């Protein structure tokens, strides 16, 4: 109780442990701020993952673009990728570029197709990141159908800059192989020979082509044969890929391909999972598929170790992925709070237990000290008694020995006297009869 006029005493200083506990208990506001920052960062990471999954989709899917006469055809691929033309068509159309169908076009059932379309698009757009091509009949050669509306249709892929390339000479076997849980995806292929390209087949003296003779139908052939398979074998010859060059020219097949994880490719093209590796025959190209050379990966459970599979799953199930992510974050925060509360409570209990143990230790130490003092006193008393006894013995033993010696000496003297008297008496008795005898 404070008396009036007396100042209030200053508060007692808090120990370092109490201050540490207060620091441990106070941070809920900081945890909330940390939680908000984590949510923002994770939302940015989720959007980045979504962008990356879209990037992968652009690299795997076939893209189609078209433009009518007088317009520009625009082809573009994302960063670190280039255009790989799959096919090109330039001809007339009644629906895409013309609102009304002329009578002349109705009566003409022939389709006006320019045979140089694919080569022209390849020259302008192949291996470019972006391509802008003016659609005009003069670009693709003579106009076979003057006065009719025509359009340019191009199918292409965006091939990454880092691809697997393989070149096989004529009359040799092409073998493509991917590791487990990955599928083949063919980006480009050409069969023939370029004029300026060195001889990679080492055939010795041979006839050089006067112009580039390449057959790009090899892309369609290999796509049918190897797309979505784990292994692929095909014989490189004119029977399968045609003969684009003059007789005597040594040709070769160049392929650019990639091995794509199973989950990603099936997410982009679900038809890949339904491919049947049974024996097939392609009537168009006369190709017989051999299931021993081309096969689909077994549908057993395979553990995908590639992190890209996670991006494919996030792309296919964005809501579920976001829900799982937020749930994991909330569970982690709850576990952190529980651990913090347990730590604070356990620290308090441990401190009280330590204090009680210290009191017990101090009491036991005092009891041990008292018992040790009592034992020391008893030991000192016990040690004093033998000392006194020994002292008594040391003082009494000489006196006792002298008295006994005197008695013993007295007894010896008495004994000697008795013996002497006996001998004297015995001597007198023996001498009397002898004297008496002489007398008588």
From Swiss-Prot:
The gene is Eva1c. Binds heparin. The keyword Transmembrane applies. PANTHER family: PROTEIN EVA-1 (PTHR46780). GO terms for molecular function: carbohydrate binding; heparin binding. It is found in: Cell membrane. The chain crosses the membrane at residues 322-342. It is a single-pass membrane protein. Ubiquitous. Keywords: Cell membrane, Glycoprotein, Lectin, Membrane, Repeat, Signal, Transmembrane, Transmembrane helix. It comes from the Eukaryota. Residues 367-381 have a biased composition (Acidic residues). GO terms for cellular component: extracellular region; plasma membrane. Residues 1-23, 364-384 are annotated as: Disordered. Residues 49-321 are extracellular. Glycans are attached at residues 62, 109, 165. Belongs to the EVA1 family. Residues 343-440 are cytoplasmic. Residues 1-48 form the signal peptide. PROSITE patterns: SUEL_LECTIN. This is Protein eva-1 homolog C. Residues 67-159, 168-260 form the SUEL-type lectin domain. Residues 1-13 have a biased composition (Pro residues). Gene3D superfamilies: 2.60.120.740.
